[in-house]
Design a protein with these regions (language model features):
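A solvent-exposed, acidic/Ser-Thr-rich amphipathic alpha-helical stretch
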Residues: 11-20, 30-88, 95, 107
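Short beta-strand edge/turn micro-motifs at domain boundaries
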Residues: 112-142
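Hydrophobic/aromatic beta-strand elements that line small-molecule binding cavities or substrate pockets
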Residues: 24, 63-66, 78-83, 96-98, ...
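Extended, polar beta-sheet/loop recognition surfaces of beta-rich domains
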Residues: 149-151
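Juxtamembrane and targeting peptides
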Residues: 1-8, 24, 28
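Beta-strand elements of well-folded, non-transmembrane domains
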Residues: 29, 98-104, 119, 136
């Protein structure tokens, strides 16, 4: 296979993966729990902001409960995602900005997170097998989350 063909294939795969990420954004905005869960494998290792330390796959009831704590849409917008693909494995990392208003809250929520996704092509579709989301915290002894940081 020529270098040009391989580069075209890699570019196509990156577009497919970015479409998965965009679909996640739309699903959360629309609070559609089934679309939120769709790109994840049943055994995906998910290290997100909420306890416990690791989730395995998406728990539909738990995710719906979380979606229902928001008044209006939830905006989780990707930025500066870098995608690397090798065969049927891909990983990407970048930032996610989260904006929304929790029910009963006086102020909207708005902060940046770091995001890493590992995907595997299964039966022709890219599926998330690993997700790690984090917010840095200040190392000054306060353990405050660094919600003021921006990319």
């Amino acid at each position: 296979m020529s270098t040009a063909v391989m580069q075209d294939q890699a570019a196509k795969e990156k577009v497919e993966i970015l479409a998965v990420i965009d679909g996640m954004k739309r699903a959360r905005h629309d609070k559609n729990v089934h679309h939120v869960a769709a790109p994840y494998t049943a055994d995906a290792a998910i290290f997100n902001l909420a306890p416990p330390l690791v989730h395995r796959g998406i728990d539909i009831a738990e995710t719906q409960e979380w979606l229902d704590t928001w008044d209006g849409p939830i905006e989780i917008t990707p930025q500066d995602f870098e995608v690397s693909v090798s065969g049927d494995i891909a990983f990407c990392h970048g930032y996610m900005r989260m904006d929304g208003t929790k029910k009963g809250a006086d102020q909207p929520v708005s902060f940046w997170m770091r995001e890493t996704l590992c995907l595997e092509r299964r039966q022709g579709e890219w599926r998330i097998v690993h997700e790690h989301t984090s917010v840095p915290f200040y190392m000054d002894g306060s353990l405050r989350p660094a919600f003021d940081l921006k990319p």
